[in-house]
Amino acid sequence: MNREPNAQLISLMAEAEVSNKGLAKRMRDLAQQRGMELGTTHVAIQRWRDGAGIRSQAAGVMADVFSAKLGRRIAAGDLGLFGQAEASTPQPVAYPAALSEALSVLDGLTEEQPQSTSSSELAIPDTDLSAAVLSWMIARPDGVQADRPSPQRASMRDVHAIRTATEMFMRLDFLYGGGHGHKALRHYFRDDVLPLLNASYTERVGHALFTVAAETAEVIGWMAYDIGNHALANRYLLSALRLTQVTGDRMFGASILANLSHQANYLGHTSRAVQLARSAVEGAKGSSATPRAKAMYAAHEARALSSAHDLTGASRAMNEAERHFEKADAAEDPEWLAYFNEAELIGEFSHCFRDLKRPVESLRFAKQAVAKTDPQYARTLGFCRIVLAQSHLLNGDLDRAIGTASQAVEEGESLQSARFLRYVTDFQGEISTHAGLPVVTRFNEQVAEAVASLDE
């Protein structure tokens, strides 16, 4: 059968300045980030240019590749592909204007595999992220559609159940890392949470439902971040940000921006981290954000500025965080903010001084962070111990540095956390100049054994 060439696809490829081989590689890479297997080759691209049909999954990936490359939303239906009856699961390349689209995006995300695809790549291009933040900043609350016709009726009992489940998964995350529970929470969110958002409910129940749904989506995103699947985490967090617009929850929305800053900073995207942290600070102004929340936003700004080696800016942000924290009252705070205690703030400061290469301050704060961190936050304690080890190294004490790091590895053996492993490997890199010493050799062997035990 003769086919007409696909003029739309040919035009998009020309605009994006991408070859058949280049487009095929971008599609394979993006699919791999999402835990999908896609065997697209340049031969397949040519067939599609010639007018052949395509599977919806491949069409969705191709559309998102063009969206990222061109800096605007490209849907699968825009590709001109024969046999493409409908677009595949939408991805939050841009900030969804309609709530229905945001919920569709989240439903699609829950179908993606949670396996680690560790990479420094983020799913949302800078242009789309800036547009998303601006949209959130200026948006008016969507509001909830109370008492609409639906075969399902939601109540506050459902809200309490979701919050209890989410808190349980948060505890698992703190104790064992994001690798524990991510898949189960993803399925719970898909099967038990998202359907309730389309149920019938009162104004009060609807408000509470969207609030707890945003919190749950944020936890799933954070788990994906900890596993090392940064593209998936990026999209979950941005989708959670969109849910906060329903109720106008600026305090929690700003905390999601702070978490996006945390992720960008971890991946070395320093400018992006600074902008997101400042967006959190500014976005929460005029809201009901508590002093503890404001301290958290400022602490994330300090972390980003420290990575940028901006001593003046980081010092200002740390002082601001400390000033807000002094006014914190647990009775005013939402439950999701309970983790941000004195130990957490001190731990953030220890990271700041480590990145600013301030040996004395880094050591002082790292010691305090280790002493004050509750062992139930096993991953956080592991981070703090590695920062303490790095602080000893900054002060020229190799033996104490390795002894402290060794304890962190021993206590963190059960952690399924790509972030914790990254802390350890970063430390290994810092002591590599002493590779000939027996103490370094023994530590490297300990790390290798600990990593191997995770696969047993």
Residue ranges and their predicted role:
Residues M36, G71-A75, K327-A330, S414:
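Charged, solvent-exposed alpha-helical segments that act as regulatory interaction surfaces
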